[in-house]
Amino acid sequence: MKIAILSRDGTLYSCKRLREAAIQRGHLVEILDPLSCYMNINPAASSIYYKGRKLPHFDAVIPRIGTAITFYGTAALRQFEMLGSYPLNESVAIARARDKLRSMQLLARQGIDLPVTGIAHSPDDTSDLIDMVGGAPLVVKLVEGTQGIGVVLAETRQAAESVIDAFRGLNAHILVQEYIKEAQGCDIRCLVVGDEVVAAIERRAKEGYFRSNLHRGGAASVASITLQEREIAIKAARTMALDVAGVDILRANRGPLVMEVNASPGLEGIEKTTGIDIAGKMIRWIERHATTEYCLKTGG
């Protein structure tokens, strides 16, 4: 099988592991920078080019598309989809997951419990917005943020108003969310592949911080999750139509709450913490689904 990995940096842990796992299972792998792909969009003979050459058909494509290049990255992935390549996460699902507001609306519509969340455009609504989520302390998030960047804990109402006004001054879209104090700076990252949680870790914020992201200095340990948490993680990934997802869960007094669904979860922290070959599980999922029948069905 020929597999393309779409990534700006093939030296990153996740890309290297996916390449290694695919090669170990006998596949040919090429890592492509999506920003160096260019496309001929033609009803008679669509094609995709890379650094001066027309690319051959790939049986499958693994998108490792960063938030900053979501627009062009998903456009390149769509072109591969048009040509019959099986995507490990479809372009439309990635774009959907990158929109935090839309994601939360979809999850809420499916009855998945979330932290109480509000959004407003007008500065006149700031006070009501704070009251809507239960007052301070609360969390203010940039809709476009990632890896814990653009996330602020406002411990007082005055601080909340100041942060919201500052973000609005940057013409940024923001979410205001209740602070789950009982989570104590911890969350659970569930790695979902297909209809299975293949690994789970607890991420704990470093002392003096509340964000548990490993990129922000958090620590990780193996997590034992409940059946309810497992079912919620799978349902959240399915709601977003993602074959592979990192589902972040907060343990609140009222039950598990989904905080975020990540369409391109990093493998380093969770593989090194659990010792589980997640990259191999992702490749095996591709083997089961990137079939000749799929290629013919999609016109490749």
Curated annotation (Swiss-Prot):
PROSITE patterns linked: ATP_GRASP
Keywords: ATP-binding, Ligase, Magnesium, Manganese, Metal-binding, Nucleotide-binding, Protein biosynthesis
ATP-grasp domain ranges (all copies): 104-287
Record-linked SUPFAM superfamilies: Glutathione synthetase ATP-binding domain-like
MF terms in GO: ATP binding; metal ion binding; ribosomal S6-glutamic acid ligase activity
UniProt-annotated binding residues for Mg(2+) 2: 260, 262
Top-level taxon of the source organism: Bacteria
InterPro entries: ATP-grasp, ATP-grasp_RimK-type, ATP_grasp_subdomain_1, RimK, Rimk_N, Rp_bS6_RimK/Lys_biosynth_LsyX
Protein name, per record: Ribosomal protein bS6--L-glutamate ligase
Coiled-coil blocks: none
Lineage, broadest ranks: Bacteria, Pseudomonadati, Pseudomonadota, Gammaproteobacteria, Enterobacterales
Binding site residues for Mn(2+) 1: 248, 260
Binding site for Mn(2+) 2: 260, 262
A cellular-component GO term for this protein: cytoplasm
The protein's role, per its UniProt record: An L-glutamate ligase that catalyzes the ATP-dependent post-translational addition of glutamate residues to the C-terminus of ribosomal protein bS6 (RpsF). Is also able to catalyze the synthesis of poly-alpha-glutamate in vitro, via ATP hydrolysis from unprotected glutamate as substrate. The number of glutamate residues added to either RpsF or to poly-alpha-glutamate changes with pH.
